[in-house]
């Protein structure tokens, strides 16, 4: 079995650690990273923050610029309940109902788990579209069957027209970021002894976008890759 491709030391966690270190003594200030990072990376950043005399609350989000502008991001916080309660009013500016999911590391794990679904759902929907089109099934007929079923996910309609038109510009979340997060998930899964080999093919497919114009485009550009053999 070939080894899993994984990611360590994400740019988000490395940059955040450098910024926190440069601040020096924190005097009970609270560090709230909101990007995607590994569980161990977040825990290490929490320990660093505490050594510098600060408090730590990881608060990664699901959503992008439109949700940020309307205060409807989904916030999944990890850290002490007391720190979460202290920062709730701030988080309420970004999310209608920010949630504390557990201690430090749990927010990071939740975010990675959700972003894995972005890759999995986009890939599976793209393959299904490719197959029914090759078989001559009208796309709308396929969607009429899919939409009322338990298999439907709203992201399918959100990305359908982009996939059909091959229009991947103006991204809210890029292909390169999706690849980075999927590799991060694979690393966390390996650390936990989970069997995630089935996702390796998706990661390999996303690697094909590296150093191409697809890398900075919307992540549904994955559809352009499923049409290649």
Predicted regions and their residues:
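Rossmann-like NAD(P)-binding element
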Residues: 1-30, 37-40, 76
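Helical "substrate-binding/catalytic lid" subdomain
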Residues: 106-226
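A structural alpha-helix within SAM-dependent methyltransferase catalytic domains
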Residues: 20-24, 46, 50, 88, ...
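Short, basic, helix/turn surface patches
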Residues: 82-92, 168-170, 223-229
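Short, composition-biased local secondary-structure segments
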Residues: 7-18, 96-101, 152-155
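Rossmann-fold dinucleotide-binding core
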Residues: 6, 30, 35-116
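Short, well-ordered coil/turn elements that cap or connect secondary structure elements
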Residues: 26, 51, 93-95, 134, ...
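Short, structured secondary-structure boundary patches
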Residues: 3-9, 15, 77-83, 159-165, ...
